[in-house]
Amino acid sequence: MQIPFTKMHGLGNNYVYIDLFDYAIDEKLYHDLAIQISDVYTGIGSDGMILIHPTTDADVGMRIFNKDGSEGKSCGNGLRCTAKYAYENGIVTNKKFHIQTKANIVEAEVSVDNNKVNQVTIDMGEPILARNEIPMMGNNDVKVVNEPFVVAGETQYITAVSMGNPHGVFFVDDIEKAPLETLGPTIEKDMRFPESINVEFIEVVSPTELNFRVWERGSGITQACGTGACAAVVAATLNEKVTKSHPIVVHLAGGDLNIEWKEDNHVWMTGPAEVIATGLFYYKEE
């Protein structure tokens, strides 16, 4: 089966995008297709696969699959790339429109120069802070803010935030010494998180800047995570390390995102989206 694709990235967080507006794929193949297409040796190579599809509830829909084939609910970098693709390929004609994910419907606004999208701003919605809605085991409706968290025999301190997908945020003094490769996979699969969790280590540079590294659920270390950057700013605000309603620059491995948690409780994200390649993927149905 020959499948047209576009590979895109948001600050290095790269996915293979498949346009289902003019092309149909049997849903039972999504899991295996995501695994095959994401393989760096025998596929295109990516952090996962995103399907751009019609929906009656918004201007465009997107479904996110990690490189292990599991389906995610939201992806900030994926939203920006989907917005760019939708505008540049005529799926939408207005610069402000709505995208549906498994988590929610978000508003996107594109900044255009010479008919090319160079920046995308997304209203990522309201953060979810109740423990049972992260979800995380324990006292149901209590916020998880700087809570002791024993892992690998050591006590870390976690702040948990959901931005449509779950994030465990840990603050460190030096981002270069963050135990991402060792604790990332351990925390991701910890039994205290029924749906597993994304893991972020954050260094506070100043009241307006954060350094950020991420271990993504189902994908491992990636260059960037948009929902994670939003969760990091919410967590930093809850821990009184930054101020609400002030733009915060989050320095990710792949570049910078501008995040603001506004007084209306919505978190806004602004950043770039880029096309890497287009082509045909030769899918072997197993």
Swiss-Prot record:
Pfam families given in the database record: DAP_epimerase
Protein's name in the database: Diaminopimelate epimerase
Molecular function (Gene Ontology), one example: diaminopimelate epimerase activity
Pathways involved: Amino-acid biosynthesis; L-lysine biosynthesis via DAP pathway; DL-2,6-diaminopimelate from LL-2,6-diaminopimelate: step 1/1
First-level EC class: isomerase
EC numbers: 5.1.1.7
Keyword Lipoprotein: no
PROSITE patterns on file: DAP_EPIMERASE (PS01326)
Source taxon at top rank: Bacteria
Positions annotated as active site in the UniProt record: C75, C225
Keywords: Amino-acid biosynthesis, Cytoplasm, Isomerase, Lysine biosynthesis
Native organism: Oceanobacillus iheyensis (strain DSM 14371 / CIP 107618 / JCM 11309 / KCTC 3954 / HTE831)
BP terms from Gene Ontology: lysine biosynthetic process via diaminopimelate
GO CC, one annotated term: cytosol
Matches recorded under NCBIfam families: DapF
Catalytic activity: (2S,6S)-2,6-diaminopimelate = meso-2,6-diaminopimelate
Coiled coil residues, start to end: none
Could be important to modulate the pK values of the two catalytic cysteine residues, annotated site positions: H167, E216
